[in-house]
Every structure is written in C-alpha cells, then in structure tokens.
C-alpha cells in the first residue's frame, strides 16, 4: 500500500489524469455514521454487525485489537486492548472478503466488458462494482458499508465550494489538482460509466446513476482503496487494479506509523512494526505523503511539525521566470529560452512540472541541480554541454542538494533558487507571519472551521520549507 517516495519529475499532480496511482487507506474525519449512502445505523449496532460479518467471512481479528471511535484521532480506528509487540499479527483478511471487480456479484460481466471499461484512472471496474453492491439489499458487504463515512459529507477539497478551495489553498497546488480531477471524473462518467449502467439498467437502479454519487465514490476509492504492489519481476506490467480491504481501511494514518499491510497468496495481513501500548491507536501508513497530498486525497493534514514527509513545490516555470527576470536584453532572453528548450527536450523540466523540496533534501535533486547548472553556466560552456547533450558530464556531487548543503552552492545558483522561492511565495494569499499568528493563538485557532485548520497546516508547512530555503540562499 505504500506510496512512491518521490513524485514523478514532470507531474500534473492529479491522481486521475494518468494511470491509477497507488491508492491508500482511508482518511478519517469526525462524521456521522451511515449504512452506505442509503441510511443510518447506530454506532454500536454497526460495529457489532461488522464484527459478526468478520467471523462469517473468516476475517480474523486479534483479541488484542478493538474497532472503536473512542481513543482515535478521528472517526473509526483501531485501538490496542493489550500491549502489542513488533511482528504480531493484528488481523488477517482472506482474499475472498476483499471487494474488487473480481469478487463482486457482477464480476463475470465486468470481465466480459473489460475492454470497454478501460480509462485513464483504471478505477472504473471497481467503481461499477461499488455502485452495484451499494444498491443491493442483500450485498455480502453491507455490514462493511455500514462503517463507511457518510458519502455526502466527505471532506476532500473536491467537495468544497470553489471559492473556499481557492481562498484556503491558493498556492499549495491543491486547487489545480482538484480541477483536473473534476474534469476527468466528469469525462469518465459520461463517456464510460453512465452508458454502461444504462446498457445494464437491470443491474443499476436509477438511484445510483448520478454524477454526484460517482464523484463521491471516486473520492472514497482515492482514500480507502489499496493496490497490491507488483512483484519485482512484474515491474513492466500494468499496475494492479485497486481493491477495497475491509478492516485495513479502518486504520488511520500518521507518518510515524506502527503497522503495515503484508500480502500473501491467501490473506492480506496487518502486522505491528513497533511496540504499541495498551490503549494506543494502531496506525497504518498511506506512504510518504506531503500534507498537500493528504488533504487532496484524504481530506486532512498532519499538524506541523508532525509530518516528516512534508514537501513544498517550486513550479519549474517559476525558475524559468526568475531566470528571465535576471536578463538585461532581448539577446539574453533568447539565449535563456534556448537553454530552457534544451532542458525540456532532455525531459528534465516541463510546463506543469515542479521541483519538490522536502525538509532535509530535494526530492527532485537531479532535475533541480541540472536546471540551475544549465541556466547559470557561461554561454561557451553551455554550447559545449549542448553538443554533448550532457553525456559524459560529471554529475553534481552526491548530497550537494541536501538542504544543509545549499549554502555551499555557487552564488549564481543560490541567487536563482532564492528568486524562484520568492516568486513561489507570492502565489499564496497570505504570508508566513499571518499563519504563525493563527497557529500561536489557541483560542483563535480553535474557532477556525475544520477546513480552515487543515488548509492552514498545509500552507504553513510549505511556507516553513520555502522560508528555510530563503535563509540558506541568503
């Protein structure tokens, strides 16, 4: 289930604009308990029903764990009844209990129509399986659906009013990612999903033929589903399709997690990775996720400074703009554009790409180092470099773009990097001091809405990384 540690070098940051990324487990926010999209069920009844269902399907829960809303960071979670040691099994989910296109009641149909259901996201078969099972009164997964959050109250930014999304998340990269998601979801629904449901109207009631419900289920799959990793010898294959893993998606996330999902032929097992004290919550990981990714895909952010995987982006075009600002005449501008075009042809930069800066390192080190080098090198050196297309060129020394080594960079590199950071900071609606004032005043912070608090954590974490870069390049 772990996410890739680094983003693609040239990425549009949208999980639905390309083949399906690694989905993770669920983001948890305090929401009323539903029984799927059609009704409500008291919490104790829902948990009891789910536990009875676990027994029926052979999902084995350790007696040391408890499914509960009490003692969790948000919503449902899993808590240790007794102390747990590393390596202990927390629960085991038989593959027959997984909800996927291969296990649902219309699996044969989905397999026959597989060619017609292909999409950029790769999620359509699972989403159709969910749409069918949700409407079925006797669905084998009904007790599992009872633990889902209320679909109409998901907190992903795609459900925020556009004005609120822009106001709270401007500069973070989230509004742009959401807009791409919404365009792709709408296209996928009307071109593939709705025609399929209408062609099989006996299997899909009018109540589930809804773009809004489809959008909600996309958010659910984005947040709750898992994707089994390929074996090393299968690296050239297409990624595995996402699937729903009951019990595993109950666990909440923190960067310093204490459990991990393991895959085997018959079972998926959640195993403790570090000691868990009695009464403490059991946490899985969604991978190395920056706060902007967490809020985009799951609807929450980790409070500063807890997310050690947090990052800030410097748009590649911002570096180009900063370099252009340093030119003095048209000749210099044309020469700089020539260098940029060279970098584009080398696939090191792109119009929608970003340089990703972590707390301790530059995650896109090769791309940023080469870009700074090419844009700052003397004209004659660039001509030689271009003729060789970079072949045989000595690479930047290992670790030269570790955050602590940035002061050692050439002055021209530091100046360009600093100017790029300043341009990036201008894209936010507020400055760092405004965020610090909100965070330091507990009374004021407590009065903020959930969305305002989460967005503040995203903005603040990014700005702290960017301001540290300013200090190191001064």
From Swiss-Prot:
Domain SET: 63-287
Function comment: Protein-lysine N-methyltransferase. Monomethylates 'Lys-310' of the RELA subunit of NF-kappa-B complex, leading to down-regulation of NF-kappa-B transcription factor activity. Monomethylates 'Lys-8' of H2AZ (H2AZK8me1). Required for the maintenance of embryonic stem cell self-renewal. Methylates PAK4.
Organism: Rattus norvegicus
Residues that, per the record, bind S-adenosyl-L-methionine: 74-76, 224, 252-253, 298
Subunit composition and interactions: Monomer, homodimer and homotrimer; these structures are stabilized in the presence of S-adenosyl-L-methionine (SAM).
Annotated positions of the Phosphoserine modification: 14
Pfam families per record: Rubis-subs-bind (PF09273), SET (PF00856)
Family of this protein: Belongs to the class V-like SAM-binding methyltransferase superfamily. Histone-lysine methyltransferase family. SETD6 subfamily.
Gene from which the chain derives: Setd6
Protein name: N-lysine methyltransferase SETD6
UniProt EC number: 2.1.1.-
């Amino acid at each position: 289930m772990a996410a890739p540690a680094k983003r693609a070098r040239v990425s549009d940051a949208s999980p639905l604009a390309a083949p399906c990324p690694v989905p993770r487990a669920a983001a948890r926010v305090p929401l009323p308990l539903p029984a799927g999209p059609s009704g409500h069920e008291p919490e104790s009844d829902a948990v009891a029903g789910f536990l009875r269902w676990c027994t029926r399907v052979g999902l084995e829960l350790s007696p040391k764990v408890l499914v509960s809303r009490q003692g969790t960071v948000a919503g449902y979670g899993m808590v240790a009844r007794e102390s747990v040691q590393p390596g202990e099994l927390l629960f085991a989910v038989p593959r027959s209990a997984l909800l996927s296109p291969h296990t649902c009641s219309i699996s044969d149909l989905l397999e026959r129509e597989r060619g017609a259901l292909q999409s950029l996201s790769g999620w359509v078969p699972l989403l159709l399986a969910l749409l069918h099972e949700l409407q079925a009164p006797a669905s084998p997964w009904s007790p599992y659906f009872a633990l889902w959050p209320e679909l109409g109250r998901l907190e992903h930014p795609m459900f925020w009013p556009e004005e609120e999304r822009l106001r709270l998340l401007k500069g973070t990269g989230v509004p742009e990612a959401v807009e791409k998601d919404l365009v792709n979801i709408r296209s996928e629904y009307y071109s593939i999903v709705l025609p399929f449901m209408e062609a099989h109207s006996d299997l899909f009631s009018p109540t589930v033929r809804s773009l809004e419900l489809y959008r909600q289920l996309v958010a659910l799959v984005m947040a709750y589903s898992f994707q089994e990793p390929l074996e090393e010898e299968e690296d050239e294959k297409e990624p595995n399709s996402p699937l729903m893993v009951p019990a595993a998606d109950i666990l909440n996330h923190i960067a310093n997690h204490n459990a991990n999902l393991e895959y085997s032929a018959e079972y998926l097992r959640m195993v403790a990775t570090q000691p868990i004290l009695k009464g403490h919550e059991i946490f899985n990981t969604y991978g190395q996720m920056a706060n902007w990714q967490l809020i985009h895909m799951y609807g929450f952010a980790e409070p500063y400074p807890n997310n050690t995987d947090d990052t800030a982006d410097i748009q590649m075009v911002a570096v180009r703009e900063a370099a252009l600002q340093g030119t003095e005449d048209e000749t210099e501008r044309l020469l700089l554009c020539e260098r940029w075009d060279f970098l584009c042809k080398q696939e090191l930069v792109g119009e929608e790409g970003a340089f990703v800066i972590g707390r301790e390192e530059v995650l896109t080190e090769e791309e940023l180092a080469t870009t700074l080098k090419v844009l700052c090198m003397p004209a004659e050196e660039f001509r030689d470099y271009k003729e060789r297309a970079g072949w045989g060129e000595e690479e930047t020394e290992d670790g030269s773009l570790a955050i602590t080594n940035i002061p050692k960079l050439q002055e021209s590199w530091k100046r360009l990097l600093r100017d790029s950071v300043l341009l990036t900071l201008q894209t936010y609606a507020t400055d760092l001091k405004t965020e610090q004032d909100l965070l330091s005043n507990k009374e004021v912070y407590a009065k903020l809405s959930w969305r305002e608090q989460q967005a503040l954590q995203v903005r603040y974490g990014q700005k702290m990384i960017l301001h540290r870069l300013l200090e190191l390049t001064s």
